[in-house]
């Protein structure tokens, strides 16, 4: 692939577009155009912002394609409302707030992260605690994080439900489930599978409330556990899933997590990790490669890996029949089974 100088300029200036859209979402600008078209003066009054700067923002959003304009009135196309209006299920404002609060400041220190091969939490937040300890100290930040992950997971969940037969299992435990989107989808498609979610204590209350709001409070149980410490309430669950989480940790910590899950699993159980791995030759894809840099600036050694690297860790942790399973959608499944009892280890 050959890129031009203009391609480079466009990529270097890409944050202009990002900040424009995030600002509009933060102001809930699109909410005011859901039911009727409005002119710049009306929008400025509703946003409680000066007319000149409001019009500058509206012009930019029109130029980017999010708004249309006719006879001086700005219009929000119907097909954009699902992800731009704040009370819609797929609203992207959760992601926008997370980017503004955490990711954008951290990425401002990418050069230092590369030079020193370490996260930039101390520089940005004045706090050397873990990424998740910083994130979970504010309930609003937890909500933003879990909500946008739930939105991100939708295409993966559709593919997982379509291509994997959950009916072969009696009980399914989803570790780190966000807003519970995957277990909810399994509940809707497989009435005979017992369902539970394992979450950190800091997020379990949020998740229980979310499940009750959606009508799944009785159908899906919420358990508390920790993959790092090994305090995992896996019990007799014969299918365990860890979604888009291994990459948050350094390879040596990933191995600890995998061993803890393996030790807690019942014999005959199956474990699946879903990730967006690098290509086998580590040439991309672009999103995963950039996500790996996001792990660099924010986490303690988190990194994206190739399928073979994930499989190697599965084998080291003790899993049998470790393999890659391709499904529809953006993620890949890394699958392994437990076929023998632990040597001297105790079950949860």
Swiss-Prot record:
Keyword Transferase appears in the UniProt entry: yes
Involved pathway(s): Antibiotic biosynthesis; prodigiosin biosynthesis
Annotated keywords: Antibiotic biosynthesis, Methyltransferase, S-adenosyl-L-methionine, Transferase
InterPro entries, per the entry: COMT-like, O_MeTrfase_dom, Plant_O-MeTrfase_dimerisation, SAM-dependent_MTases_sf, WH-like_DNA-bd_sf, WH_DNA-bd_sf
GO molecular function: O-methyltransferase activity; protein dimerization activity
Alphabetized Gene3D superfamilies for the sequence: Vaccinia Virus protein VP39, Winged helix-like DNA-binding domain superfamily/Winged helix DNA-binding domain
Null mutant phenotype: Cells lacking this gene show an orange phenotype and produce norprodigiosin.
Any single Pfam family the record assigns to this protein: Methyltransf_2
Residues reported in the UniProt entry to bind S-adenosyl-L-methionine: 199
EC number of the protein: 2.1.1.-
Enzyme type, top EC level: transferase
Protein family (similarity comment): Belongs to the class I-like SAM-binding methyltransferase superfamily. Cation-independent O-methyltransferase family.
Biological role: Involved in the biosynthesis of 4-methoxy-2,2'-bipyrrole-5-carbaldehyde (MBC), one of the terminal products involved in the biosynthesis of the red antibiotic prodigiosin (Pig). Catalyzes the transfer of a methyl group from S-adenosyl-L-methionine (SAM) to the hydroxyl group of 4-hydroxy-2,2'-bipyrrole-5-carbaldehyde (HBC) to yield 4-methoxy-2,2'-bipyrrole-5-carbaldehyde (MBC).
Name of the protein this chain belongs to: S-adenosyl-L-methionine-dependent methyl transferase PigF
